[in-house]
Swiss-Prot record:
Residues 29-158 form the VIT domain. InterPro entries: ITI_HC_C, ITIH, VIT, VWF_A, vWFA_dom_sf. It comes from the Eukaryota. This is Inter-alpha-trypsin inhibitor heavy chain H3. Belongs to the ITIH family. Residues 284-467 form the VWFA domain. It is found in: Secreted. Residues 1-20 form the signal peptide. Glycans are attached at N91. I-alpha-I plasma protease inhibitors are assembled from one or two heavy chains (H1, H2 or H3) and one light chain, bikunin. Inter-alpha-inhibitor (I-alpha-I) is composed of H1, H2 and bikunin, inter-alpha-like inhibitor (I-alpha-LI) of H2 and bikunin, and pre-alpha-inhibitor (P-alpha-I) of H3 and bikunin. The keyword Nucleotide-binding does not apply.
Amino acid sequence: MALAQWPYLILALLSGLAVSGFPRNPSLLLGKRSLPGRAVDGIEVYSTKVNCKVTSRFAHNVVTTRAVNHANTAKEVSFDVELPKTAFITNFTLTIDGVTYPGKVKEKEVAKKQYEKAVSQGKTAGLVKASGRKLEKFTVSVNVAAGSKVTFELTYEELLKRHKGKYEMYLKVQPKQLVKHFEITVDIFEPQGISTLDAEASFITNDLLGSALTKSFSGKKGHVSFKPSLDQQRSCPTCTDSLLKGDFIITYDVNRESPANVQIVNGYFVHFFAPQGLPVVPKSVVFVIDVSGSMHGRKMEQTKDALLKILEDVKQDDYLNFILFSGDVTTWKDSLVPATPENIQEASKFVMDIQDRGMTNINDALLRGISMLNKAREEHTVPERSTSIIIMLTDGDANVGESRPEKIQENVRNAIGGKFPLYNLGFGNNLNYNFLENMALENHGLARRIYEDSDANLQLQGFYEEVANPLLTGVEVEYPQNAILDLTQNSYQHFYDGSEIVVAGRLADEDMNSFKAAVKGHGAINDLTFTEEVDMKEMEKALQERDYIFGDYIERLWAYLTIEQLLDKRKNAQGEEKEILTAQALELSLKYHFVTPLTSMVVTKPEDNENQTAIANKPGEGPLDAEEVPSMAYLTSYQAPQTPYYYVDGDPHFIIQIPEKDDAICFNIDEDPGTVLRLIQDPVTGLTVNGQIIGEKTGRSDSQTRRTYFGKLGIASAQMDFRIEVTRENITLWNGDSLSTFSWLDTVMVTQDGLSVMINRKKNMVVSFGDGVTFVVVLHQVWKKEPAHHDFLGFYVVNSRGMSAQTHGLLGQFFHPFDFQVSDVHPGSDPTKPDATMVVKNHQLTVTRGSQKDYRKDISVGRNVACWFVHNNGQGLIDGIHRDYIVPNLF
């Protein structure tokens, strides 16, 4: 199971003089300097608030800073936040003089193109980059006019992981100046009940903290508030410097009347498991230590100091050994030995005598350690009910013996065979951390970077403490067959004391009366099974404290866990498997608005008749991929490229969006139910799309008011001999003579060379042909007892770059550039919808201003799209007449 990463947040606000455009040197924005008073260069930060809501370990954090420019000229203001590496940004908004500019999460490839254009123009400023051990720095800068106000609001979410028996939230506070309204508010809601809650600050004495801090908890609720006055913020009674510079730490734990707790909201569930009071399972541990020349000096002394402290904590029931590697491999003992006082004393002397020397032979050292653990198990020289772990520490890359990372990974994977975990500790930055992480992950362990600081020995000790006390091995979390969908990881090699296993998923039947779960594992004495049964009505009562619950928190927790685990699996996947994992993680990231390694957040703000576009990326631990946007993202001043898109949805409304005009044209087609219309036909690529019309459940006598929709779509590729029939119930795929049928209740991805089909349960289907063509089919479901309307389909073309110039059809003809002019706007028969004259394709038409719905992102409500409506079935806009597009069947 994944071990804890402490959540961190650092707040800092910088201000500087405005410059023409934006500075070319990112350090102008990222450099820190002391700000002496409440206002600097005319910029006053008058409010900074951090609002954290924690519901069942899932934290929703909003950081809001407000500033005003008192100067007579425009100034540049920068907003700095450091957030946990384990967190996902979910939103950023910029509000200037009451106008709010929201952020949008997009696929990273889109941001990459914007970044490349920005670099070519030389207009860049830092936005997001990795910062320190557990942090990522978010920085955004904006020009603020004289007398204007600006508000920055950043939202991020993460799952708080249990670490040594507590959930911990670290807020690193650093406002850089006195702030009139400074406040941190944390509200915690835990259905199990809160057992402990504490808060402390490293930058203020307990006497001063007491009057600025309030903390309380009772039953399920906990509350912490830190609200220092201006005088309490001063570094001395007459100073204008702020003493708010350091850690604000909140820790808590929950009641554990039973080992497990299950919570269910809106068809999603989360299962927490953390038993207490179990005897510790004896362990066999092999320490594989790099003693190459690069470990010379301080690193070697810190490593030896940590190992000596670890030896003091090894339990007498444990077995251990040390393997040292440089250019060759040496061992303390030929085999594992029990941790008797005599052996511990001898091991301590061995550690003190370690000397650095030579090269780095990782492969042979790991294989020696694995062989030692396997042999001890096979020869029964260790207790039957014990577990094995291997811990490697290295500060560099393999450079002797087998040095190819992929071959070392293969050798280690085959040798371990899934029997025990490998933990890799990377000392410093001069190593291939991705290699260490990937090798650990595929062997049920994890990697941790050890930073070259004065506390490196404490970092090593702290890691060992996390794995020192296994309480269970071979943990399996089980649910009734066919009751659960989309389950996160439910199998773990170990459960360690002070940690917690978290599993989430979706109920197949939301109307069930009860829910059962079982956790099985091997204990120190016998095999254990922990069962939990939930009464759904009782669960509903227990979760009625809606004031503390933000939205569908369990669904978002499930999405967070799923994305995190998909990204971990993706690191070692190859070929088609990697493509599927990437597509699944990307789809969830976009759906739930998470900034992950596959997505970026883009904020666009009009300024000086240009668009200012901020792009926020998710950095990683490893070295930069040359093909990706750097982990430092950018704020650019240029017109972001826009892509036209086309769709038909509703009654059936055809909408053509034209970015060059910042406008749209729409028209209806009024035809009888059963009619099939040609939407797209490309004779070059062989792609066709046809749609069949359905009517209402009860016909209307007035044909002018009847409503029709698309009830069936046919998508075909002649070149690939591939067809898709989409109805309101099923999706059928033909690949030559092979047939596959899925329902709208499925979530599944089908891929082959040049094609991917992603079905998202009860929502939409995304079809991509290579990189140049993407269609989206949206499923609209109505209340089953609705007297008039059926379920129906919407069809969207979101990428048509791969279509040829010969493409035609009711939608396809508009893939080619065309122009239109609108003039003589005047009141129409409906006072809310003006009429106008449109000149298009050598026709002069009377059009009406109206709006249609875009349901791609919000199926239930949709987004209004303003458009000019062309009457009479699009006559004059479409080539020919609408009946020219009627075809006999779907294919």
